[in-house]
């Protein structure tokens, strides 16, 4: 008898939205039900009525039918990536694809795409760690969060959390990236609109695209973002003593990186 209500939903099929109807929930009014039971016992009756209360879904089919406008979209290229990285970009996009964010809700990219394991569809590929590139499961997932970030800011949604990479990335202009790493770097955004939004993610082996759908308040409004470098910091040389090397021997651990 007890069942939680389910909000209406949508899915994309053949380039169109299909609305999935909401479901009414049910719960028992325990006080009234117990009172009915007590009366039945006192009257030596074998039956009594359950006081069932309906719980309506918060968002109905009418609300979901409002999702039809493109609020923001963005595409990045990854066709030249190694096989493992391509696998990770496509896998990450598929996990975010179809996400519905209701008004007031916050979507965490890290929670949506993790864990970064072989069992969860990820492969080994390069990722940034302590100023170096190392092989990890899920390497390249930051291109997924970055592409979504750029679609989200064009939809003018609120960014709750966003971090830049420790080094520059090639697939977006400087300052347009959004890194995720463990639980200490995430990309989160909040639906500050009064209608639900739908996230579509597509990866075809060459490009990844995220599109945010919802209800556009002003069809004539457009937004544009510019990347401007205000300061350049050249790298410096750092020498570390290593007793395992022969006297006078030097080994290059890593190249320096220009900061911006």
What is the meaning of each model-derived region?
Residues 1-260:
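Well-ordered beta-sheet/strand-loop patches within structured domains
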